């Protein structure tokens, strides 16, 4: 279950827009919340904002390509995107 603080954080990230689009020079793309899973509970996982294209697209997204191919294709890691978005929303 999400806390009020988690919901506020997720809302702030979604308002920022897709962090990968931002990195590519396209600011403000509507975003969904992507949980970075490294074991443990999903509710405890760090999250990044990704647009539907980069989140769920068949051959363009983290879920469509898998993490390793996604990171290779876009020359960045989930952790690097997390660090970037946290810097930008502060």
Where would I find each of the regions flagged by the language model?
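A broad, low-specificity signal marking well-ordered, structured residues that form hydrophobic/aromatic
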Residues: 31, 48-49
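Intrinsically disordered, low-complexity cationic segments
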Residues: 33-34, 53-54, 62
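Helix-loop segments that flank and shape redox-cofactor active sites
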Residues: 31-39
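Cys/His-coordinated zinc-binding microdomains
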Residues: 22-23, 52-55
């Amino acid at each position: 279950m999400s806390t009020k603080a988690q919901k506020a954080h997720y809302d702030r990230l979604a308002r920022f827009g897709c962090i990968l689009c931002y990195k590519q020079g396209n600011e403000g793309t509507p975003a969904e919340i992507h949980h970075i899973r490294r074991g443990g509970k999903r509710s405890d996982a760090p999250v990044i904002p990704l647009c539907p294209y980069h989140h769920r697209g068949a051959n363009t997204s983290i879920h469509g390509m898998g993490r390793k191919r996604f990171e290779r294709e876009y020359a960045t890691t989930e952790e690097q995107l997390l660090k970037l978005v946290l810097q930008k929303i502060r």
